[in-house]
C-alpha cells in the first residue's frame, strides 16, 4: 500500500466537493477544478476530509494510489490558495511585457518572442524583468513557467537567460588566453 495514498486530504473551510462516480469537482474561492479518478480508486468525504480507497491489488493500482491522492491534494490547495511561480530575466536589453492575453519578451533575438497565455493563468510583470505566473492548476502553472523559461535557458558563461527565482546557475570560467 502507498503511504501517501492512505493519508486523508484535509478540506479547508469554504471548499465544496461533489463526487459523481469517479469524477471529483472541487470549488473554492479561487475557482473550480475537475479531477477524474481511475476505475480502481474510490473517493468519499468523511469528517471534513477526502479519503481515497484502492479497490484493486495490481501493481499499477498501487502506483496510481499515491499519485492521484497528491493530484487531488494539489487541486484542493489550488482552489483554496492558488499556486505561483516566479521567473527572472537576466541580460542586457532583456525585458517582458503583458499585452492582453500575450506575453511579449525581448530576449536579444532579431524579433520579439510572443507567448499566448493559456486560460486560467495570469502573468504579472514587475520591473520589466520579474515575472509572476499564477493559477489554480499546479501542473499548468509549472508547464507555463517551463515553456517561458525554455525560450532562453540560462547559459553558464554570462548567466543570461530566463531562470526561476532562486535558481542557481553553475557558472563556467570560459576560455583563457594562452601565450
From Swiss-Prot:
Belongs to the universal ribosomal protein uL6 family. GO terms for cellular component: cytosolic large ribosomal subunit. PANTHER family: 60S/50S RIBOSOMAL PROTEIN L6/L9, LARGE RIBOSOMAL SUBUNIT PROTEIN UL6M. Keywords: Ribonucleoprotein, Ribosomal protein, RNA-binding, rRNA-binding. InterPro entries: Ribosomal_uL6-like, Ribosomal_uL6-like_a/b-dom_sf, Ribosomal_uL6_a/b-dom, Ribosomal_uL6_bac-type, Ribosomal_uL6_CS. This protein binds to the 23S rRNA, and is important in its secondary structure. It is located near the subunit interface in the base of the L7/L12 stalk, and near the tRNA binding site of the peptidyltransferase center. This is Large ribosomal subunit protein uL6. HAMAP family: Ribosomal_uL6_B. One of its GO terms (biological process) is cytoplasmic translation. The keyword Ribonucleoprotein applies. NCBIfam families: L6_bact. It holds the Pfam family Ribosomal_L6. The gene is rplF.
Amino acid at each position: 500500500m502507498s503511504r501517501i495514498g492512505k493519508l486523508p486530504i484535509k478540506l479547508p473551510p469554504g471548499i465544496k466537493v461533489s463526487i459523481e462516480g469517479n469524477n471529483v469537482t472541487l470549488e473554492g474561492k479561487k475557482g473550480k477544478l475537475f479531477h477524474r479518478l481511475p476505475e480502481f480508486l474510490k473517493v468519499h468525504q468523511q469528517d471534513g476530509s477526502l479519503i481515497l480507497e484502492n479497490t484493486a491489488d495490481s501493481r499499477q493500482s498501487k502506483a496510481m494510489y499515491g499519485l492521484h491522492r497528491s493530484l487531488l491534494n494539489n487541486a484542493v490547495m489550488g482552489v483554496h490558495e492558488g499556486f505561483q511561480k516566479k521567473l527572472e530575466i537576466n541580460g542586457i536589453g532583456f525585458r517582458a511585457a503583458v499585452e492582453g492575453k500575450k506575453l511579449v519578451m525581448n530576449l536579444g533575438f532579431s524579433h520579439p518572442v510572443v507567448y499566448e497565455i493559456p486560460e486560467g493563468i495570469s502573468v504579472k510583470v514587475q520591473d520589466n524583468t520579474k515575472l509572476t505566473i499564477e493559477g489554480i492548476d499546479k501542473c499548468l502553472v509549472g508547464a507555463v513557467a517551463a515553456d517561458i523559461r525554455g525560450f532562453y535557458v540560462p547559459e553558464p558563461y554570462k548567466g543570461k537567460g530566463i531562470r526561476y527565482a532562486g535558481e542557481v546557475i553553475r557558472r563556467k570560467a570560459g576560455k583563457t588566453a594562452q601565450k
